[in-house]
Structure formats: structure tokens, C-alpha cells
């Protein structure tokens, strides 16, 4: 089986330089949603028909999921763009004669693989199967014209008679059929219609004339066949998607303070008794352990947060690729925020405290370590029970290379210190507040590295 995705349209009503199919829904391009769904159908190949912004569209989806899913992603271009039938004609040289073809639209992102499997089953090996739906207001859609219960044709809005425009069953833009018949029917298309285009929907009348059964698989879920032609439609579909995700999470036992104020732009996996406050955004792959609490207005990307951890409001967690060394890990019982920032490579152990306006990047903090206020830890290895003072930073970059700072167990760093890497502070050592430390320090020592305090009596400030 081959899957053909039409993605050539300009999307004039989007009023954007970005090709329509590359606008984002739930953090992924519209077209990527469709490609990812096609990946679940055991297809031999996916053929994407591009046109407007072809190079940009092709670059955006090339290499995504195809090889790992066991099929190829190929591109053909529709230039000029002379209608949906003309678009699919461009894919003909890549289609096998002995297989089935599923035709999808790149701007209909929420079609589900299960629905497509039902459509494919309805087509069997010898039928033309159309995915249809009833709309109270069918304006703009091709109408399904029947004689009795038998589908006879699809009539586009501009070509429909007043009687046909009263029909509420419409074509979704999705079909499944044998490749051999598709090729034959595409060769018979003409432009004798109100728009002067080659309509893919005209193949229905050819199927009827040739005695090929035409079946309509009707669904009720309008979000699955909703297209995106404007920012208004995109926003509406985004809300529909997020509402569905929120419902699924709540059915799994997640406590959402307000399901209407949640955004999941990837995969969110939650254990038992997780609670999420309002206006939180989850991107990439995020895993929340049992009893995790997420405060309001947090943004969390590619992170694993262990049981009992609390992420206070306005915390940003910015992990790298899932499964890589740059993914963020937060240990059990950790307390993060408010207003904390965990960047790629932050690995926090059990009961670690990261407080307000603390930034951690590419650093490992062992059990019980604390940095509670106004601090930076970059490229650092922090031992158990370390206390890192307010206003302190690791100076990890020399202008060309990054260097590591090691704080061994039970170290105490006073406020407003600068630790210039590479540097090791020995176990149990203390660094006095305001110190700039450039050399390794021995275990258990107090290190003070600051200018001597001088008070000048009767000092008079300059005046104009």
C-alpha cells in the first residue's frame, strides 16, 4: 500500500510566508501530523506532493520517521497547480499497479490511523472507499450524491445545483482505492468545470461508469476531517486537540486545575496522583512520576521528573533530545522553583533544592544538594548535601572552551562567589562569601579569596 499526501497549496488565507502545511499544531507541523499517522499504516511508501514552498516543505519532513518506520518518504512537485486531480497525477510514476493507495490531505492533521484502517478495510482490494461526514453547514465541501443508498458522484460546491447544495453528507478529501484503477481514472480527467481544474473527485463518476463499487465510510468526529485554511481554523483545531488530550489525562487520574489551560506539544506520560496547575506547556517527551506536582505557568521540555518532586510556578525546564545526555532529570522529592531554569544536561538527584532565579546547565547535583537563590551552575558536578550560596556562579567558559567545576560532598559555598573552572572544591570545604576562587582547595578547608576590607574615615564623595 502507498500513501499519497497532497501538500502543494499556498494557504492564502493564512496570510503568512510560511507554507500552510508547516504551520504548527500542538508543536508539530500540520503535515508532520499526517506523515506520522501514515507511519502507522504499514505503508510501503509515502509520497508527498509539494508545490508552494516545496523546498521548505521537503526539508521539514525529510528523514522524519520514514526509514525507522519501514517505508520511504518521496516527494513530487505539482507545478503549476491545476487542481487536486492534477496533484495526484504527479505521484502516478511512483505508485505500484498491484497495490492500494490512500489519499490524504496535508492540512487535515488530526485524522486517526484507526479511522484510516476502517476505510482501507472498506475498500478491500477492488472498491473505491470515500471518507465522509455529515455537516449541518456543508458550505465549501464536495457533496456526496447518491441514487438511493448508492454513491453516484461527488459534486464540488461551485458546480453543485441548488438541490445538491442541500445535501449535508460531504467528502472529507480522504479516499482509498486500487492503484491500477486510480491511474486509469486520473488519465481520463478534464477541466470542464466551474473552476477550470482537474478534480480528483471526478474519479467517482468514472468508477460508477466502470462498475467499480463506491462505498462511503461515514464518521461522526468532525475534528478528524477538519482542514486548516486560516489562523482562526488553526486555533480552533488546536483547542480541540488539547481538549482531547486533557480529557485523556484526567481519565488516567491526572488532576488538572483547568483542562482548558493546558498545552501538550508532544508526549506527556503521567503516573498516579500527578497534579498540574494552569497554563503549563509540555513539549517533546515529558514523564511525571507518582505524586509529582507542577505549579502554574511552567514550561517543561524533554524531562523526566521522579516521584514526589514539586515544580513550583514559572519554572522553565529545557531538556535536549529524549534519551540523550541533554535530557533533564529531576530526582524524587526534589523542589524546583519558583522562577528556576533547568537547561540541557541538568541531572538532579533525590531531594535536591533549586530555588528562585537559579539556572542549572549540563550539571549533576547529588542527593540533598541545594542552590536556593540567584545562582548559576554550569558544567558542574555537585556532591551530596552541598549548599550553594546566593549570587554565586561557576565561570565555566574561557571564550573558547567549557571547563568543569567539581564541588565534593558537604561543600558550603558562601554568597556571591565566583568559581573559575577548571576547579575542584574538596569535600567538606567552605568558600567564604564574595570569594573568587581560581585554584583547587583541600578537603575541610575554609577558603577566602577576596580583597582586604578597608574603611577610610571621613571620606568625602566627589561633588559637582
Curated annotation (Swiss-Prot):
The active site is at residue 373. Its EC number is 2.7.7.23, 2.3.1.157. Mg(2+) binds at residues 107, 229. GO terms for biological process: cell morphogenesis; cell wall organization; lipid A biosynthetic process; peptidoglycan biosynthetic process; regulation of cell shape; UDP-N-acetylglucosamine biosynthetic process. GO terms for molecular function: glucosamine-1-phosphate N-acetyltransferase activity; magnesium ion binding; UDP-N-acetylglucosamine diphosphorylase activity. Its cofactor is Mg(2+). Keywords: Acyltransferase, Cell shape, Cell wall biogenesis/degradation, Cytoplasm, Magnesium, Metal-binding, Multifunctional enzyme, Nucleotidyltransferase, Peptidoglycan synthesis, Repeat, Transferase. UDP-N-acetyl-alpha-D-glucosamine binds at residues 20, 78, 83-84, 105-107, 142, 156, 229, 343, 361, 376, 387. Catalyzes the last two sequential reactions in the de novo biosynthetic pathway for UDP-N-acetylglucosamine (UDP-GlcNAc). The C-terminal domain catalyzes the transfer of acetyl group from acetyl coenzyme A to glucosamine-1-phosphate (GlcN-1-P) to produce N-acetylglucosamine-1-phosphate (GlcNAc-1-P), which is converted into UDP-GlcNAc by the transfer of uridine 5-monophosphate (from uridine 5-triphosphate), a reaction catalyzed by the N-terminal domain. In the N-terminal section; belongs to the N-acetylglucosamine-1-phosphate uridyltransferase family. This is Bifunctional protein GlmU. It comes from Albidiferax ferrireducens (strain ATCC BAA-621 / DSM 15236 / T118). The gene is glmU.
Amino acid at each position: 500500500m502507498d500513501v499519497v499526501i497532497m501538500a502543494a497549496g499556498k494557504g492564502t488565507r493564512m496570510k503568512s510566508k510560511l507554507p500552510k502545511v508547516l504551520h504548527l499544531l500542538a508543536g508539530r507541523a500540520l503535515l508532520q501530523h499526517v506523515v506520522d499517522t501514515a507511519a502507522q499504516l504499514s505503508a510501503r511508501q509515502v509520497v508527498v506532493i509539494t508545490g508552494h514552498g516545496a523546498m521548505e516543505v521537503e526539508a521539514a519532513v525529510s528523514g522524519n520517521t520514514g526509514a525507522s518506520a519501514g517505508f520511504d518518504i518521496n516527494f513530487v512537485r505539482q507545478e503549476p497547480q491545476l487542481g487536486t486531480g492534477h496533484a495526484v497525477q504527479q505521484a502516478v510514476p511512483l505508485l505500484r499497479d498491484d497495490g492500494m493507495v490512500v489519499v490524504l490531505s496535508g492540512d487535515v492533521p488530526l485524522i486517526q490511523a484507526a479511522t484510516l484502517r476502517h476505510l482501507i478495510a472498506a475498500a478491500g482490494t477492488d472498491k473505491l472507499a470515500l471518507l465522509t461526514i455529515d455537516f449541518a453547514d456543508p458550505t465549501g465541501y464536495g457533496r456526496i450524491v447518491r441514487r438511493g443508498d448508492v454513491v453516484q458522484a461527488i459534486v464540488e460546491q461551485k458546480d453543485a445545483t441548488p438541490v445538491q447544495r442541500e445535501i449535508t453528507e460531504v467528502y472529507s478529501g480522504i479516499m482509498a482505492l486500487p492503484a491500477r484503477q486510480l491511474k486509469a481514472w486520473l488519465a481520463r480527467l478534464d477541466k470542464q468545470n466551474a473552476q477550470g481544474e482537474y478534480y480528483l473527485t471526478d474519479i467517482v463518476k468514472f468508477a460508477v461508469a466502470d462498475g467499480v463499487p463506491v462505498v462511503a465510510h461515514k464518521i461522526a468526529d468532525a475534528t478528524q476531517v477538519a482542514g486548516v485554511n486560516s489562523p482562526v481554523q488553526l486555533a480552533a483545531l488546536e483547542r480541540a486537540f488539547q481538549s482531547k488530550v486533557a480529557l485523556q489525562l484526567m481519565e488516567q487520574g491526572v488532576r488538572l486545575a483547568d483542562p482548558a489551560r493546558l498545552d501538550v506539544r508532544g508526549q506527556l506520560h503521567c503516573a498516579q496522583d500527578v497534579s498540574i496547575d494552569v497554563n503549563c506547556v509540555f513539549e517533546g517527551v515529558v514523564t511525571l512520576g507518582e505524586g509529582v506536582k507542577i505549579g502554574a505557568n511552567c514550561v517543561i521540555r524533554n524531562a523526566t521528573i521522579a516521584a514526589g518532586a514539586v515544580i513550583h510556578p514559572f519554572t522553565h525546564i529545557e531538556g535536549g533530545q529524549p534519551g540523550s545526555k541533554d535530557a533533564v532529570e529531576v530526582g524524587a522529592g526534589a523542589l524546583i522553583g519558583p522562577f528556576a531554569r533547568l537547561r540541557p544536561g541538568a541531572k538532579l538527584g533525590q531531594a535536591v533544592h533549586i530555588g528562585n532565579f537559579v539556572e542549572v546547565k549540563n550539571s549533576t547535583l547529588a542527593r540533598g544538594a541545594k542552590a536556593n537563590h540567584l545562582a548559576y551552575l554550569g558544567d558542574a558536578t555537585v556532591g551530596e548535601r552541598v549548599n550553594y550560596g546566593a549570587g554565586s556562579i561557576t565561570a565555566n567558559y574561557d571564550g573558547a572552551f567549557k571547563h568543569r567545576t567539581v564541588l565534593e560532598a558537604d561543600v558550603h559555598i558562601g554568597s556571591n562567589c565566583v568559581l573559575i573552572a577548571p576547579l575542584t572544591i574538596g569535600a567538606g570545604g567552605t568558600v567564604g562569601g564574595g570569594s573568587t576562587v581560581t585554584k583547587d582547595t583541600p578537603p575541610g578547608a575554609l577558603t577566602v579569596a577576596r580583597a582586604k576590607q578597608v574603611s577610610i574615615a571621613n571620606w568625602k564623595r566627589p561633588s559637582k
